[in-house]
């Protein structure tokens, strides 16, 4: 059975970020360039402003095969003065769900 509280998602997220900025000296938000992580980064910016902790550190691990609009969104977010972006491109072995012949692929493969 579900148990509801008298708070909405925004209020709960705000409380959590206030706790984070009160109890931790270093904060870094993981950013995937999706809409959920975009909301999370904006919530972190709001909290950092309240706690005088700007800019927000954000980490984006580039998987190489991304849509142009997703990359454009990352550029927009990381060009904001409230954000210090860490854009990382590493050769990482990943599962490949789109091929039966190549079950894994290596993003940022220097040999290709």
Residue ranges and their predicted role:
Residues 1-112:
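ATP-dependent adenylation/nucleotidyltransferase module used to activate substrates
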């Amino acid at each position: 059975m579900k148990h509801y509280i008298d708070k909405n998602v925004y209020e709960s997220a705000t409380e959590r970020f206030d706790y984070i900025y009160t109890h931790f000296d270093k904060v870094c938000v993981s950013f995937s360039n999706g809409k959920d992580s975009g909301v999370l980064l904006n919530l972190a910016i709001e909290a950092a402003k309240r706690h005088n902790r700007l800019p927000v550190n954000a980490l984006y691990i580039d998987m190489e095969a991304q849509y142009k609009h997703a990359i454009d969104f990352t550029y927009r977010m990381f060009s904001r003065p409230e954000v210090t972006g860490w854009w990382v491109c590493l050769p990482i072995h990943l599962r490949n769900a789109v091929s039966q012949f190549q079950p894994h692929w290596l993003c940022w493969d220097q040999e290709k």
